Amino acid sequence: MKKDLTLYETRVVGVLLEKEITTPDQYPLSLNALVNACNQKSNRHPVLELDEATVRQTLEALQRKDLVKGSSYGSRVEKYHHRFCNTEFGELKLDAQQVAVVCELLLRGPQTPGELRSRASRMAEFSDVQATESTLKRLLEHKLGPLVVMLPREPGKRESRYMHMFSSDIEPVETAAPSDSGSISAYKAKITDLEVRLEALQEENDALKKKLRQLGQVV
């Protein structure tokens, strides 16, 4: 299994995994649909602004790695589907919960089991946080080698975060004594965590407003 994906490649693969599950009637994706999905504001971190040429180049790189396939499907518009997992062309096999967790890690970066349970539940069922932790354990012990890694717990946090192992851009985690640069890194991490939590609250608020409108109430 190739573990040398760039940020843009992980975003494209994550999007294809996501849309295959959440909007199967619109899958495979055209180049235009893929660009829009890569750049959407919700369920993404970091938020990107990729142009069509960049996404096309990323698709070409993934095709050379046999992780994406493009086909016309009887029309003039070429559409793309992944070969990342659970296909006859690759050796990586994942169950539904593993796919959901890996997808969220590809789309959002490092997350805690609690965050993963909340976010991945749109793609697979997780009865509780323990179910998410069990899924992470299976990914850690995968027969092809660890597919995720647990990061050292950040100061003041109850849970450790996990990140995927499909990228060559994974940065080593500093475990040395705190320094000025370490303090800055910790501060930035706290800001990122707050941004993620705020985004989740905004999504919940939007969903609640939608439900209220469906009930005929004015917000």
UniProtKB/Swiss-Prot annotation:
Gene3D superfamilies (UniProt xref): Winged helix-like DNA-binding domain superfamily/Winged helix DNA-binding domain
Family, as annotated: Belongs to the UPF0502 family.
Superkingdom as given in the UniProt entry: Bacteria
Coiled-coil region: none
Pfam families: DUF480
Protein name: UPF0502 protein HCH_06091
PANTHER family: UPF0502 PROTEIN YCEH
Protein species of origin: Hahella chejuensis (strain KCTC 2396)
Entries under SUPFAM superfamilies matching the protein: Winged helix' DNA-binding domain
Signal peptide: none
